[in-house]
Amino acid sequence: MARDVLTDLTKVRNIGIMAHIDAGKTTTTERILYYTGITYKIGEVHDGAATMDWMEEEQKRGITITSAATTTFWGDNQINIIDTPGHVDFTVEVERSLRVLDGAVAVFDGKEGVEPQSEQVWRQADKYEVPRICFVNKMDKLGADFYYTVRTIEERLAAKPLVLQLPIGSESDFQGVVDLVRMKALTWRGEVKKGEDYAVEDIPAELADEAAKYREQLVEAVAETDEALMEAYFGGEELTEEQIKNGIRKLTINREAFPVLCGTAFKNKGVQPMLDAVVDYLPSPLDVPPVQGLLPDGETAAERKPSTQEPFAALVSKISVHPFFGKLTYVRVYSGKVSSGTQVINSTKERKERIGKMFQMHSNKENPVDEIQAGHIYAVIGLKDTTTGDTLCDPQNPIVLESMTFPAPVIEVAIEPKTKADQEKLSTAIQKLAEEDPTFQVKLDDETGQTIIKGMGELHLEVLVNRMKSDFKVEANIGKPQVAYRETIRKTVEKYEYTHKKQTGGSGQFARVIISLEPIEQSADSATYEFENKVTGGRVPREYIPSVDQGAQDAMQYGVLAGYPLVGIKVTLLDGQYHEVDSSEMAFKIAGSIAMKEAAAKASPALLEPIMAVEVTTPEDYMGDVIGDLNSRRGHIQAMEERSGVRVVKAQVPLSEMFGYVGDLRSKTQGRANYSMVFDSYAEVPANVAKEIIAKATGE
């Protein structure tokens, strides 16, 4: 039976489960749902039966693709959980879930320690200042090493681990944990009723010294949070359990340290103490600073406190298509409350919206609620023009909350429907999937008439194409993956003048613009473009300025070298001229567009390609072959290190050189090496390679 949403926000936790692919996130979430009483049968990822992996694609692959949201209770506390994907191609899901969370559980593989994707997700959580606790999972795995994993958290993430538990036994002999706060042993003997019952015992004699050492470090870290505690500690007083817990909570919420616990979710050991830690140490909506935003003027800062007494404000974190309700919009409510049927304003797009039915979600099942209120995550239906990152708020007290930034797609494929009937279904499928996923983009190739879909990697596009088949019944042919190149400029062009004039009977067209172009720094997660207006004395009327901006942006879509989108450019409108009768928005848009294109051709244009951060794990014997192969792919070796008896090579390699790498690596190392790859940045293509790419793109 669904319980009501808690209004006492001190007892609410909005958390995410984040990790590298295969570290055991979904299994951990499943166990949480089981122990908190929502699922009555434990779902296993291996069987394709996990509750949170509700899309057919996820169940088939055993990985999480979209961040399912679920609400559950632990004791008298409410935990809203988002299970995020760990595969690099689905960064957008991680990004948008972290934006609306207050805290997270970072799950690590007890044998592998910090892996490349865990590092990337950790950095994303740093960006949104999310407090975390760490759960070292898979302690029953052959080669699991708790202390090694703690070391990698410190070294690779430059984070301060705060060890709260030590493992009792390891690998197949892993029996439980030493709780350093209570100084007791918690043991799970055998497979007792799915691990629900655990014994609280004295610490085994052989672990007493180790436990005392780590307890000392813990108490010292806690004492440093408060002068009174520091005096008591150095005065030889024992700190109480409550004082220690309060100190850990303070360190965690301030992100000065990250509590580390351990267990094995698959074998049902260590999950309940981890849930206790979520409640004890992660922040409630009241512990995080008020959410920041801007008033509609776009300049005045404003904030909303997490209270139902404040005006309503919510951020849209995700859109998904539901088989019965159609468009489901997930929102994190930061302040105020609204009931069904209320009119709100989408302040990002300045559109009115009416909220229809509202639900508290459990994976893909829904519990209807009468009102949505501050501090919680819900799904609502009935919103027409709202997309991910938009703000919904009280029409009388508008605010625009900080949105999310999503990386530009790096790979594209052509897609062709097999029949005329598929053509219509394909358009619907593409529109719905693009609504759900901001990193999935579509364009029509003007020359070939083909539909091109773009995404974050081969797996990302493969999953989307398979969803078109399963969810929308579209049959389509898919082309070979292509790299999403970009173009940029290398030098500044001052005062470039263009006049657009047309006289064909009746009123003509007239617009003169003088612009400058300059290269600007590009960030990994946005295709940068800036526009500045420096026109004085009304030489270009104010109502035409946005048209020049729009024209320049239109021209950015097709670069001058090979027709790839332009990035990293600042356009400044310096001066211009207009005609009382013949000038129009359209005339200035055309002038802005052509001026931009012609000026870019004079600004030393260059071709850019996506560079991937590649990490290869290989036995020592194949090290030479692996490095030689990466060098032959125009790779730059960044670092080499030893990790758990194998060698790790880190390199930066152009994406265009990485197609088919998985097969080549397998054959070179007899299948003993593996690799991971994440998008790093865009970089200039060497001249000899660029020449070939441009010739191919322009058909020369």
UniProtKB/Swiss-Prot annotation:
GO molecular function: GTP binding; GTPase activity; translation elongation factor activity
Domain tr-type G: 10-286
PROSITE patterns on file: G_TR_1, G_TR_2
Cellular component aspect of the GO annotation: cytoplasm
Source organism: Saccharopolyspora erythraea (strain ATCC 11635 / DSM 40517 / JCM 4748 / NBRC 13426 / NCIMB 8594 / NRRL 2338)
UniProt keyword Nucleotide-binding present: yes
UniProt entry tagged with the keyword Nucleotide-binding: yes
Pfam families: EFG_C (PF00679), EFG_III (PF14492), EFG_IV (PF03764), GTP_EFTU (PF00009), GTP_EFTU_D2 (PF03144)
Name used for this protein in its record: Elongation factor G
Major localization class: cytoplasm
Family per similarity comment: Belongs to the TRAFAC class translation factor GTPase superfamily. Classic translation factor GTPase family. EF-G/EF-2 subfamily.
Function: Catalyzes the GTP-dependent ribosomal translocation step during translation elongation. During this step, the ribosome changes from the pre-translocational (PRE) to the post-translocational (POST) state as the newly formed A-site-bound peptidyl-tRNA and P-site-bound deacylated tRNA move to the P and E sites, respectively. Catalyzes the coordinated movement of the two tRNA molecules, the mRNA and conformational changes in the ribosome.
